[in-house]
Amino acid sequence: MEKITASVRLKKTRGERNRLLKEGKVPGVMYGKNIEPVAVAVNARELESLVERGLKLFELSVEGKTQRVLVKELQHHPVTGKLIHVDFQVVESGRKIRQLVPVELYGEPAGVKAGGILEHGLSEVTVECLPEDLPEFIEADVSKLEVGDCLRVKDLELPPGVRVIEDPESIIALISAPRDYVEEEEETTTSAPEATA
């Protein structure tokens, strides 16, 4: 399991936060069940590297003590997009966690080959599982979808030990008819001759 080191932050002022960001560190907080929240700072590059690779669960070493943590929330600067804050939740072995996981679509839908348009619904879902079973992402095969078909949460193939906490009917992806096809169909319906009595 990947590991990064954090230092404890004694000051929690805006000036201290700005100083850390200039030094290439990201301020954050580490918390968990029966644990007092601890203000920490981590190396921005190390954290970004883990996040870019989709790793949300790793070890965090604080003052020589290592905890298994989950990245619960990331805050980015609204203009620059740089990381400005992170929340780490300490997780315990044997205790289930809930976490947002991205859904990655793969395959070229049959409906798109026939001229349809692939529309995305949910791009991530909340899952519940043990920390060691947490997937980086959930794959969804859309290759068999025809025009008018949709893939719902209930259709996702999940890894063992993982359960989705979302409405099973929520749409992940759907194939809609091309706009000109819909307009053509409407014109045909409206211009049909009326039956005479």
Curated annotation (Swiss-Prot):
GO terms for molecular function: 5S rRNA binding; structural constituent of ribosome. It comes from the Bacteria. InterPro entries: Rbsml_bL25/Gln-tRNA_synth_N, Ribosomal_bL25/Gln-tRNA_synth, Ribosomal_bL25_b-dom, Ribosomal_bL25_C, Ribosomal_bL25_long, Ribosomal_L25_dom, Ribosomal_uL5_bac-type. GO terms for cellular component: cytosolic large ribosomal subunit. One of its GO terms (biological process) is translation. Keywords: Ribonucleoprotein, Ribosomal protein, RNA-binding, rRNA-binding. Belongs to the bacterial ribosomal protein bL25 family. CTC subfamily. Part of the 50S ribosomal subunit; part of the 5S rRNA/L5/L18/L25 subcomplex. Contacts the 5S rRNA. Binds to the 5S rRNA independently of L5 and L18. NCBIfam families: bL25_bact_ctc. This is one of the proteins that binds to the 5S RNA in the ribosome where it forms part of the central protuberance. This is Large ribosomal subunit protein bL25. It comes from Carboxydothermus hydrogenoformans (strain ATCC BAA-161 / DSM 6008 / Z-2901).
